[in-house]
UniProtKB/Swiss-Prot annotation:
Biological role stated in the UniProt entry: Probable promoter-specific protein mediating the interaction between DNA and RNA polymerase.
Gene name in the database record: ycf27
Gene3D superfamilies documented for this protein: 3.40.50.2300, Winged helix-like DNA-binding domain superfamily/Winged helix DNA-binding domain (1.10.10.10)
Subcellular locations according to the entry: Plastid, Chloroplast
Organism: Galdieria sulphuraria
Additional remarks: Although originally identified as Cyanidium caldarium, these sequences derive from Galdieria sulphuraria.
GO molecular function: phosphorelay response regulator activity; transcription cis-regulatory region binding
Gene Ontology biological-process annotations: regulation of DNA-templated transcription
Upper classification of the organism: Eukaryota, Rhodophyta, Bangiophyceae, Galdieriales, Galdieriaceae
Keywords, comma-separated and alphabetical: Chloroplast, DNA-binding, Phosphoprotein, Plastid, Transcription, Transcription regulation, Two-component regulatory system
Entry's Gene Ontology cellular component terms: chloroplast; cytosol; protein-DNA complex
Record has Phosphoprotein as a keyword: yes
InterPro entries noted in UniProt: CheY-like_superfamily, OmpR/PhoB-type_DNA-bd, Sig_transdc_resp-reg_C-effctor, Sig_transdc_resp-reg_receiver, WalR-like, WH-like_DNA-bd_sf
Keyword Signal: no
Protein name as annotated: Probable transcriptional regulator ycf27
């Protein structure tokens, strides 16, 4: 375990003491600093006091449920959030993602599965924050969007659009393959770092696509940038096609 990883704090919020105890023990052994909270109010207190690197939220918690905690965190931070959801409730999973969670794990779960998801999400976030060391990236203008690759920022009609690390990584993947359909499985593997074991695993992709459309498209119900490829997955419209309808044409400016 490297020194950087050992400094990372994980906040576990779950009202089941056995789950908190098991996860605290296992995650501590592999080098994380672990904080635990038995309810949503305590989770928010620890979030503001300790500034964790990643938060794991159970949906059903007293005082403030996982949805409420997720909403409050997203008002001020884009740190990774993983939801713990009930096995039979698809609504729990989708709602959490729509509120800004990056991923979910279904209860009952193997601690090893959650450990793997935590590693994957943190690795992707590391890529988001540290990939600005590349010198051959710059600013890309696509229609009404300006994408600053170095600073990992997106502007729509000159107004800053706030994206989470996962959302930016997803957008970057789509743009780098513009005009090429990408399957949900491919997107999940490239952005989240794991292969789906169940069909429902790919719903995380659908919800993040929906979130990107809501933030970037003029009319999310009739998208012009991020298109659905029937029977395949999604694709980002060919950049030259986009710029036929917008002015100025695409420019790449070195920083």
């Amino acid at each position: 375990m490297d020194n950087l990883r050992r400094k990372e704090k994980i906040l576990i919020a779950d009202d089941e003491s056995s789950i908190r105890r098991i996860l605290e023990t296992r995650l501590s052994i592999i080098g994380y600093e672990v904080l635990t909270a038995p309810d949503g109010r305590s989770a928010l207190f620890l979030f503001h006091k300790e500034h964790p690197n990643l938060v794991v939220l159970d949906v059903m918690m007293p005082k403030i449920d996982g949805y409420g905690v997720c909403q409050e965190i997203r008002k001020e931070s884009d740190i990774p959030i993983i939801m713990l959801t009930a096995l039979g409730d698809v609504t729990d999973r989708i709602t959490g993602l729509e509120l800004g969670a990056d991923d979910y794990v279904v209860k009952p779960f193997s601690p090893k599965e959650l450990e793997a998801r935590i590693r994957c999400v943190l690795r992707r976030v590391d890529k988001f924050y540290f990939s600005n060391t590349f010198t051959n990236s710059g600013i890309i203008n696509i229609g009404f969007l300006k994408i600053d690759i170095n600073r990992k920022q997106v502007y729509k009609n000159e107004e800053r659009i706030r994206l989470t690390g996962m959302e930016f990584n997803l957008l970057e993947l789509l743009i780098s393959n513009s005009g090429e359909p990408l399957s949900r499985t491919t997107i999940l593997e490239e952005v989240w770092g794991y292969t789906p074991e169940r069909h429902l695993d790919t719903r995380v992709v659908d919800v993040h696509i929906s979130r990107l459309r809501a933030k970037l498209e003029d009319d999310p119900s009739n998208p012009e940038l991020i298109l659905t490829s029937r029977g395949t997955g999604y694709l980002f419209q060919r950049i030259m096609e986009i710029n036929k309808n917008y002015n100025p044409i695409i420019q790449i400016q070195k920083i």
